[in-house]
Amino acid sequence: MNKIQHISFITKKNPLVSYERVGALQNRFVQHYLNYKANKVEQPPKPTIITSQVCPVYTLGRRESSINFTKGFPKAKVVKALRGGQTTFHGPGQILAYPIIDLKSFGLSPREYVSRLEQAIIATCKSFGIEKAHTTKNTGVWVTENDKIAAIGIHLRRNITSHGLALNVSTDLKYFNYIVGCGLYGKNTTSFKDQGVFTDLKSVEKVLVNNLDSFLMSK
């Protein structure tokens, strides 16, 4: 049984949700943690993971003020995010996973936290036969030195995590052609489908959440 509470927006009836709606729920959980730390509420919050598949959107990192598309203007919204990192794309065929936990409770540094996110993603990829999944000097999970399958961008406030990871399962990769993903020139984005693995989001979501639970909840 998972130690972490899981809330999923990925359903057959409503497979897509707005990025803003996911963010609003995430902020509610973060605020609960902050209120608890400030002794404003007695009930401690539960460690939580929110997973979703959002409508097409480009998000800017907190240090960016605008986006420069490399060619034309794609049909997608542009939204400012609090996470670290630079511009990336979120949309159909991609799993967004936002863990909301107190790093201090688990004795994790921000660097160790990111490392555990990467380990959970790698374990998930390998469960579906993508054995080449690995880390490099650049944050995220890669299948070659130039092909990234998952991006990571986090935000911390009083050791409370928000935002998290984006894992490409069957994402339409053309959206990445309009940007320099995460500010990394000469790098590409790949997906399970692009790697010859054809599966559905719910199957990958289940394995990913179990792996995140295993890697994040162990002290």
UniProtKB/Swiss-Prot annotation:
The active site is at C182 (acyl-thioester intermediate). Pathway: Protein modification; protein lipoylation via endogenous pathway; protein N(6)-(lipoyl)lysine from octanoyl-[acyl-carrier-protein]: step 1/2. InterPro entries: aa-tRNA-synth_II/BPL/LPL, BPL_LPL_catalytic, Octanoyltransferase, Octanoyltransferase_CS. Substrate binds at R83, G84, G85, Q86, T87, T88, F89, H90, A151, I152, G153, G164, L165, A166. Coiled coil: none annotated. One of its GO terms (cellular component) is mitochondrion. The keyword Transmembrane does not apply. It catalyses: octanoyl-[ACP] + L-lysyl-[protein] = N(6)-octanoyl-L-lysyl-[protein] + holo-[ACP] + H(+). It holds the Pfam family LplA-B_cat. Its EC number is 2.3.1.181. GO terms for molecular function: lipoyl(octanoyl) transferase activity. Residues 43-219 form the BPL/LPL catalytic domain. It is an enzyme of class 2 (transferase). Catalyzes the transfer of endogenously produced octanoic acid from octanoyl-acyl-carrier-protein onto the lipoyl domains of lipoate-dependent enzymes. Lipoyl-ACP can also act as a substrate although octanoyl-ACP is likely to be the physiological substrate. This is Probable octanoyltransferase. It comes from Schizosaccharomyces pombe (strain 972 / ATCC 24843) (Fission yeast).
